[in-house]
């Protein structure tokens, strides 16, 4: 039987002294000019490594997860995992101990046992060494995404990383090599791939509703004026107290946050599942808003703000498709991810309102009979036809997780992303996004910077799959056989029910609170009482679920 409940508090660890620093231009990137194009070279795959296209890992009946980074995005992830059956939250880690401890509240409310707490600049290092963790979920500031993920993979953990998961090509290649070497999943946590509209549009694309999709658009357009002051100020690396996100935009050029717009359209275009990005050109405006913000915060002139207020990146694929991605977090305008698909037989757009354009014959061919006679692709579908089309092509992911997802907030896409990841781990299936997706979606920062720093020159993409981008024909989500899925789900529900019963039976939270409040004289006694209760609870859970 696996260890079920960890000995919280015994691992209350703190570390210091390490400062991560990421830049969108990595010194190890090799490139050369070829007829006016910057050709970024693809490193040779190290001997003995194999690609991880369609990687499957051994089934994990109970997914033991640790969270690193509990500032803005991390607490929500902890809360969501409390509602996924068959999960054990083993550890919580943040630079600031209080933030990690605060997330215990989600576990307490859900009736789950306390997790171990880690803190400090390198608290994650000891966390990653633990043998009783299957998945490390990284939601730190951008500078720490890579070092935490690297440490987790080096210690044999599946790894899920908030976006952007890698800040430059050097980090992309190192994560690729580690995933290939360890045969562990390294997933980019791109939640916008699980937006309800994007999921259904993907279903339609795969069914040919839009014909062949030739052009796509995506973006992250979100004025962050209301948020800049809330980003963490690293005491070791932010003397001007700009906050990590503004500081990164000041110091780096290129689309530094491309994945929300790029991820969903890349799936629709089957990137590295039959097609690949080949060429990129990027342009940006001058910096106005960001520069003015820094000057207001520091009281000094800012003459070196690298990131333009608005960045536009154009990409072409091997199959002749074109993608446009935009980034603007500076200027006042409504939130917009664009998400537009232009096909040979139809068109889809999410903003400013969700809509689809098909003519009468294509709508009929797609399985929906029009209720009006003059239907034309010159206008969008009427409400009834649109609703019927969305219902017919509703994603199985939405059918399974959509209702609970909406209750969990942020439109439901975060919960569906996490639930799908756990589902795939429990069923031994390939994850929805792999390490090559991570690299392809995150590389726009460095490649775009190369383009713009060289008079907006064309830049040739490296092949992150190193020759395997055409092995799989078409993007698809993996599903277990119905009987296998049902058995795994039943076991997960039974496990979580047994955990909750025994947390209450053995008064684990009362004993945890006693341990927290104990003075030096009574600390050892309180620790012993808590540890004994944990052992008894583990034994009872094992008997109830018959885990081996």
What residue ranges belong to the model's regions?
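Bacterial N-terminal signal peptides
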Residues: 8-16
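Sec/Tat signal peptide C-region and signal peptidase I cleavage site
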Residues: 18-22
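C-terminal helical cap and adjacent loop that interface with cofactors, partners, or active-site loops
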Residues: 24-39, 43-47, 53, 75-76, ...
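A structured beta-alpha segment of the ubiquitous adenosine-cofactor-binding alpha/beta core
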Residues: 116-134
């Amino acid at each position: 039987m696996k260890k079920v409940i960890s000995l919280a508090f015994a691992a209350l660890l703190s570390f210091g002294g390490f400062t991560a620093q990421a830049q969108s231009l990595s010194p190890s990137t090799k490139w050369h000019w070829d007829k006016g194009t910057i050709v970024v070279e693809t490193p040779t795959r190290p001997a003995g490594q194999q690609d991880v296209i369609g990687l499957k890992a051994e089934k994990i009946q109970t997914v033991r997860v640790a969270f690193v980074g509990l500032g803005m995005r991390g607490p929500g992830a902890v809360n969501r995992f409390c509602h996924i059956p068959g999960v054990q939250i083993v550890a919580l880690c943040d630079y600031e101990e209080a933030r990690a401890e605060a997330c215990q509240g989600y576990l307490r409310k859900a009736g789950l046992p306390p997790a171990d707490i880690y803190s400090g600049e390198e608290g994650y290092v000891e966390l990653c060494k633990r043998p009783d963790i299957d998945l490390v979920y990284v939601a730190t500031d951008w500078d720490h995404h890579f070092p935490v993920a690297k440490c987790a993979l080096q210690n044999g953990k599946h790894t899920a990383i908030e976006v952007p998961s890698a800040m430059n090509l050097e980090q992309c290649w190192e994560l690729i090599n580690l995933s290939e070497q360890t045969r562990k999943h390294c997933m980019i946590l791109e939640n916008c791939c699980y937006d309800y509209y994007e999921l259904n549009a993907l279903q339609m694309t795969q069914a040919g509703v839009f014909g062949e999709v030739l052009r796509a658009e995506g973006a992250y357009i979100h004025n962050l004026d209301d948020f800049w002051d809330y980003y963490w100020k690293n005491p070791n690396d932010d003397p001007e107290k700009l906050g990590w996100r503004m500081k990164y935009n000041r110091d780096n050029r290129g689309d530094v946050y491309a994945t929300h717009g790029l991820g969903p359209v890349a799936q629709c275009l089957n990137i590295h599942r039959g097609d690949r990005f080949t060429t990129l050109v990027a342009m940006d405006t001058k910096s106005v808003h960001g520069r003015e913000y820094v000057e207001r915060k520091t009281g000094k002139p800012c003459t070196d703000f690298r990131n333009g207020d608005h960045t536009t990146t154009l990409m072409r694929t091997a199959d002749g498709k074109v993608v446009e991605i935009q980034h603007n977090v500076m200027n006042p305008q409504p939130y917009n991810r664009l998400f537009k698909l232009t096909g040979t037989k139809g068109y889809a757009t999410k903003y400013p309102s969700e809509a689809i354009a098909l003519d009468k014959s294509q709508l009929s061919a797609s399985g929906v009979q029009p209720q009006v006679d003059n239907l034309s692709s010159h206008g969008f579908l009427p409400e009834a036809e649109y609703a019927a089309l969305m219902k017919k092509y509703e994603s199985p992911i939405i059918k399974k997780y959509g209702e609970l997802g909406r209750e969990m907030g942020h439109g439901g896409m975060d919960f569906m992303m996490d639930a799908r990841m756990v589902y795939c781990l429990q069923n031994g299936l390939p994850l929805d996004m792999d390490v090559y997706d991570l690299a392809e979606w995150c590389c726009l920062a460095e490649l775009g910077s190369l383009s713009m720093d060289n008079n907006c020159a064309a830049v040739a993409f490296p092949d992150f799959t190193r020759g395997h981008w055409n092995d799989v024909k078409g993007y698809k989500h993996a599903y277990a056989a119905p009987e296998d899925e049902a058995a795994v789900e039943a076991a997960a529900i039974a496990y979580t029910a047994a955990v909750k019963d025994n947390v209450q039976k053995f008064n684990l939270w009362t004993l945890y609170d006693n341990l927290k409040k104990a003075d030096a004289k009574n600390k050892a006694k309180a620790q012993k009482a808590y540890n004994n209760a944990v052992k008894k609870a583990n034994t009872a859970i094992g008997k109830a679920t018959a885990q081996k």
